[in-house]
Curated annotation (Swiss-Prot):
It comes from Rhizobium johnstonii (strain DSM 114642 / LMG 32736 / 3841). The chain crosses the membrane at residues 29-49. Peptidoglycan polymerase that catalyzes glycan chain elongation from lipid-linked precursors. It comes from the Bacteria. One of its GO terms (cellular component) is plasma membrane. GO terms for molecular function: pentosyltransferase activity; peptidoglycan glycosyltransferase activity. HAMAP family: PGT_MtgA. This is Biosynthetic peptidoglycan transglycosylase. It holds the Pfam family Transgly. It is found in: Cell inner membrane. Belongs to the glycosyltransferase 51 family. SUPFAM superfamilies: Lysozyme-like. InterPro entries: Glyco_trans_51, Lysozyme-like_dom_sf, PBP_transglycosylase, Pep_trsgly. Pathway: Cell wall biogenesis; peptidoglycan biosynthesis.
Length: 245
């Protein structure tokens, strides 16, 4: 009479063992996902330290693929103010006034998307910085959902000066060219501190597509766009007070 229960227990043991093993694997997966999601927020706090020079995911990719890259970190004090003016007027005119996300612009972007219309970029400098530091290129709702809270946190934790300094030192300005110092030397053979207003505007308008837009050898369309940004930058005094006041 006792044989059947013993056989049943012996049959159940492998199933129980597999269940516990599967549960351990699931726990490890959940833990790994949580670490991946939380780590960027810890790094943002770490980047408060002025002597820390962050690298972007694209720079890490180039290292993994053994391509190498050129990036020479410079402080904001060693970057010509015309660069900041031009980049802000080209990429994020409301940089000093929003909290990481320009919600009015984002709302219009969503409305255009729902209507099936061609959309503008809509990414602020904090959003671009968060993407460059922690995420991947390419448009997707998943990336945008991860990018928004990272941008808000980045803008909240870091000062506007520190955030701009990081952005200008990790932005891509050509294949394997990262940061404003490497870009200035590569395209114009001068340090970032010596860039002219025209050169700064050319670098600024190449940011959305640095592989195809060559600031050092601009086409007619790029020169025309740079002229627009150059004029805006000349009247940008009220827009850059969070950086230089």
């Amino acid at each position: 009479m006792d044989i059947a229960p013993e056989r049943e227990d012996s049959v159940d043991m492998p199933a129980r063992r597999r269940w516990f093993e599967d549960r351990r694997v699931l726990k490890r997966i959940v833990l790994a996902v949580l670490i991946v999601l939380i780590l960027p927020y810890a790094l943002i706090v770490f980047y408060l330290l002025p002597f820390i020079h962050p690298v972007s995911t694209l720079m890490l990719r180039d290292l993994v693929l053994l391509r190498g890259y050129d990036r020479q970190w410079v402080s904001l004090d060693n970057i010509a103010p015309v660069v900041v003016q031009s980049v802000m007027m080209s990429e994020d005119g409301q940089y000093c006034f929003h909290g990481g996300v320009d919600w009015a612009e984002m709302r219009m972007l969503v409305e255009d998307t729902l209507k099936g219309q061609a959309t503008r970029g809509g990414s602020t400098i904090p959003m671009q910085t968060a993407k460059n530091l922690f995420l991947w290129n390419g448009r997707s709702f998943v990336r945008k959902a991860l990018e928004l809270p990272l941008a808000v946190t980045t803008d909240f934790v870091l000062s506007k000066r520190r955030l701009m300094e990081i952005y200008l030192n990790i932005a891509e300005w050509g294949p394997g060219i990262y940061g404003i110092e490497a870009a200035a030397r590569h395209h114009f053979k001068v340090p970032a501190s010596k860039l002219t207003r025209r050169q700064a505007s050319l670098l600024a308008v190449s940011l959305p597509n640095p592989i195809d837009r060559n600031a050092g050898k601009p086409g007619r369309g790029l020169r025309r766009l740079a002229g627009v940004i150059e004029r805006r930058a000349q009247g940008s005094g009220d827009y850059i007070k969070c950086i230089y006041d």
